[in-house]
């Protein structure tokens, strides 16, 4: 169960940052400019509200968090409430932690296959190479608002049916990411306080 949950965290973080990178161009946001602008991103930080709808639950599950990303290969994806957890990536090394009994505890879940796929995808997305994705096909709609549609290929569609990245009117920012999952489940992530190409301490990627 934990392994499935962490697989979802890995994919959510990768897709979310890919969306933020894609949103860099100005209001026209044509596909060529989206790809070209990806190379200009050095860092991203943002806060988010995640709302997950499950068929078995009447009310959605709400989570709040934040993330920090460096183009050099570092990522911190952190849930702040209702439960605290964090994924730290630095290069090829990924560590997963949850906060329990007043302390951070490292997860022993391997999720090797998911990690490998996500890292491979991220390396392509950050360069604007959406066409080279091995696990998603893509389509772009200029809108307004502009949208990037990602459709999973065979294998990944076991737990993700489709992803829609909705671009904001504000250049450099996306409005939300909507993820459709099997069993009439869905996840929606809305962003606020997005900052691009800002500085933050490298220790954010070393410890919870």
Please report, for each region that a protein language model flagged, where it lies by residue.
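One face of beta-strands
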Residues: 42-50, 63-67, 73-77
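Gly/Pro-enriched, hydrophobic low-complexity segments
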Residues: 130-208
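Flexible, processing/modification-adjacent segments and terminal tails
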Residues: 29-53, 58-60, 98-156
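Solvent-exposed coil/turn segments that connect beta secondary-structure elements
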Residues: 49-51, 72-74, 80-82, 92-94, ...
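N-terminal secretory signal peptides that target proteins for export/translocation
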Residues: 1-5
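Boundary at the C-terminal end of the N-terminal hydrophobic targeting segment
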Residues: 21-28
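Bacterial N-terminal signal peptides
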Residues: 9-20
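An acidic-aromatic
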Residues: 66-118, 187
């Amino acid at each position: 169960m934990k392994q499935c949950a962490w697989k979802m965290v890995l994919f959510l973080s990768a897709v979310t940052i890919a969306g933020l990178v894609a949103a860099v161009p100005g209001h026209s946001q044509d596909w060529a400019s989206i790809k070209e602008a990806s190379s200009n991103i050095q860092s991203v930080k943002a806060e988010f509200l995640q709302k997950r709808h499950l068929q078995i639950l009447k009310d959605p599950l709400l989570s709040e968090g934040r993330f920090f990303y460096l183009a050099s290969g570092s990522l911190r994806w952190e849930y702040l409430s209702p439960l605290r957890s964090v994924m730290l990536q630095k290069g090829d090394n990924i560590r997963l932690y949850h906060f329990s009994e007043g302390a951070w505890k490292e997860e022993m879940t391997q999720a090797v296959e998911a990690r490998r796929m996500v890292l491979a995808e991220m390396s392509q997305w950050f360069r604007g190479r959406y066409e080279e994705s091995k696990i998603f096909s893509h389509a772009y709609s200029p809108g307004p608002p502009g949208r990037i549609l990602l459709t999973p290929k065979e294998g990944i569609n076991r737990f993700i049916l489709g992803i829609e990245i909705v671009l904001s009117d504000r250049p450099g920012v996306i409005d939300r990411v909507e993820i459709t999952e099997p069993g009439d489940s869905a996840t929606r992530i809305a962003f606020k306080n997005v900052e691009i190409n800002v500085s933050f301490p490298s220790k954010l990627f070393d410890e919870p």
